[in-house]
């Protein structure tokens, strides 16, 4: 049995059409399946949690197979609902606007071919899982936060605090984004919001602690991206050395660089060449603790729930069982 999780709003609203084509493939191959369509924020998490509760409790040795049809955000919501990562196998057919997970894993091609590969896979790719913990009470929630905001969140690609998360928060609530996505101009949304947030985002000071060692200060920081994979934000290679199986994060920390210089540094990040600019620092660690002097937006795989001034991020090595 395979459980299909579909975001019908993905692919500029064509997710449902894509599912209908894939459903034809499943029927043709006589594949036993169930289909679940999400209807709004938090719905995928609820569906996956119920599947885990119902299916995994019946048999202590059973394995739940899930195939996600959506973007990085849909995959992220799926992770929040999983109760036992050792007994859940996930396939992924990317239909989002960023697709950073698929970009780094080389998942590309016809949807029907991807589906066939997932169904035939018997040796999952074991991939690191990130776990974010908020340590302070939420003072400000995002405009599209779920009804219940947990103090912990999982992620597969990256977790960011500051400027990158502020872009995500505005993009998630942007009606302008939905319009441009339908016109095939989704990238223009992020460019517009990125320029706006570059002007509006206020910097702060923070301390960073890696693997429990001596904390160090980063003054006037713009953002800190903690990454499992190389890409974030639709193709920016912020961490070119990131390895999704090594049990460690790679960090891109942007300090007191002039905002005008950021306009030159960001395009260079598309090829991972941004560290030649001053005040952009690479770090790594299996555990990251950040204490900021005030709350900043925080994202996990582009999903934003709340602001925070105190977070811990831990890497759980090879916890995700990915079918591909």
Regions found by a protein language model. Give the residues of each.
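Catalytic core of DAGKc-family lipid kinases
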Residues: 3, 84-220
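ATP/nucleoside-binding phosphotransfer catalytic cores, i.e., glycine-rich phosphate-binding loops
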Residues: 15, 210-218, 237-324
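Glycine-rich beta-strand-to-loop/alpha-helix junction loops that act as flexible
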Residues: 8, 69-71, 93-96
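ATP/NTP phosphate-donor binding region
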Residues: 1-66, 76, 80-81, 113-115, ...
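A residue-level signal for conserved active-site and pocket-lining positions in enzyme catalytic cores
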Residues: 7, 44, 130, 167, ...
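Glycine-rich phosphate/pyrophosphate-binding beta-alpha loops
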Residues: 160, 164, 223-239
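Short, solvent-exposed amphipathic alpha-helical segments in soluble enzyme
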Residues: 19-22, 52, 83, 172-175, ...
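Short glycine-/acidic-enriched loop or helix-start segments at secondary-structure transitions
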Residues: 15, 77-79, 102-104, 166, ...
């Amino acid at each position: 049995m395979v459980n299909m999780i579909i975001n019908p709003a993905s692919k500029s609203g064509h997710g449902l059409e894509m599912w209908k084509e894939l459903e034809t493939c499943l029927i043709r191959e006589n594949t036993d399946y169930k289909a679940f369509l999400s209807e709004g924020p938090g719905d995928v998490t609820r569906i996956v949690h119920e599947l885990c509760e119902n299916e995994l409790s019946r048999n202590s040795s059973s394995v739940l197979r899930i195939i996600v049809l959506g973007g990085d955000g849909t995959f992220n919501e799926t992770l929040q609902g999983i109760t036992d990562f050792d007994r859940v196998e996930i396939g992924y057919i990317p239909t989002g606007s960023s697709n950073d997970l698929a970009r780094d894993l080389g998942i590309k091609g016809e949807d029907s071919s991807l589906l066939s590969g997932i169904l035939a896979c018997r040796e999952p790719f074991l991939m690191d899982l990130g776990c974010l913990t908020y340590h302070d009470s939420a003072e400000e929630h995002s405009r599209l936060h779920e009804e219940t905001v947990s103090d912990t969140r999982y992620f597969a690609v990256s977790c960011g605090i500051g400027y990158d998360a502020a872009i995500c928060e505005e993009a998630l609530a942007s009606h302008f984004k939905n319009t441009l996505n339908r016109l095939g101009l989704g990238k223009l949304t992020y460019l517009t919001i990125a320029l706006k947030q570059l002007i509006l985002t206020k910097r702060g000071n923070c301390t960073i602690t890696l693997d429990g060692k001596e904390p160090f200060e980063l003054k006037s920081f713009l953002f800190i991206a903690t990454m499992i994979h190389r890409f974030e934000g639709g193709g920016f290679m912020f961490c070119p050395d990131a390895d999704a199986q090594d049990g460690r994060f790679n960090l891109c920390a942007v300090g007191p660089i002039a905002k005008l210089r950021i306009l030159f540094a960001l395009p260079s990040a598309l090829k991972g060449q941004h560290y030649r600019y001053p005040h952009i620092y690479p770090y790594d660690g299996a555990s990251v603790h950040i204490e900021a002097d005030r709350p900043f937006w925080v994202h996990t795989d582009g999903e934003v729930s709340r602001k925070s001034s105190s977070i811990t991020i831990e890497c759980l090595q090879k916890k995700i069982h990915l079918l591909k």
